[in-house]
């Protein structure tokens, strides 16, 4: 029963895709200006994604090392994964707490 439901959805989706592509092809053939704009925008997207990819390959490790430090500090230089001691409210020691001095 589930297979027929999925089959119907896939058939409808493929029908919609075919209708869209045939309509797109008709528009493409009838309007040179739309085709030129589409090619221009598609080229711009491809060029931008290529530039981003090349920049990431070049500068990615540097950016990654700035934001994800390895070592004692944990991620982003914050608290380590395992705290050295329990927080003050769970501490059983009687050490004095540091207070703000004015």
From Swiss-Prot:
<comment type="similarity">
    <text>Belongs to the TCTA family.</text>
</comment>
<dbReference type="GO" id="GO:0072675">
    <property type="term" value="P:osteoclast fusion"/>
</dbReference>
<protein>
    <recommendedName>
        <fullName>T-cell leukemia translocation-altered gene protein homolog</fullName>
    </recommendedName>
</protein>
<feature type="transmembrane region" description="Helical">
    <location>
        <begin position="36"/>
        <end position="56"/>
    </location>
</feature>
<keyword id="KW-0812">Transmembrane</keyword>
<dbReference type="GO" id="GO:0016020">
    <property type="term" value="C:membrane"/>
</dbReference>
<dbReference type="Pfam" id="PF15128">
    <property type="entry name" value="T_cell_tran_alt"/>
</dbReference>
<dbReference type="InterPro" id="IPR016560">
    <property type="entry name" value="TCTA"/>
</dbReference>
<keyword id="KW-0472">Membrane</keyword>
<keyword id="KW-1133">Transmembrane helix</keyword>
């Amino acid at each position: 029963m589930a297979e027929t439901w999925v089959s119907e959805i896939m058939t409808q989706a493929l029908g919609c895709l075919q209708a869209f592509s045939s309509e797109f092809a008709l528009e493409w053939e009838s309007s040179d200006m739309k085709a030129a704009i589409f090619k221009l925008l598609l080229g711009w997207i491809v060029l931008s994604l290529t530039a981003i990819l090349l920049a990431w390959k070049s500068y990615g490790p540097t950016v990654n090392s700035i934001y994800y430090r390895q070592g004692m500090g944990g991620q982003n230089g914050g608290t380590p994964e395992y705290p050295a001691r329990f927080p003050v409210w769970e501490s059983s020691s009687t050490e004095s707490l540091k207070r703000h001095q004015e």
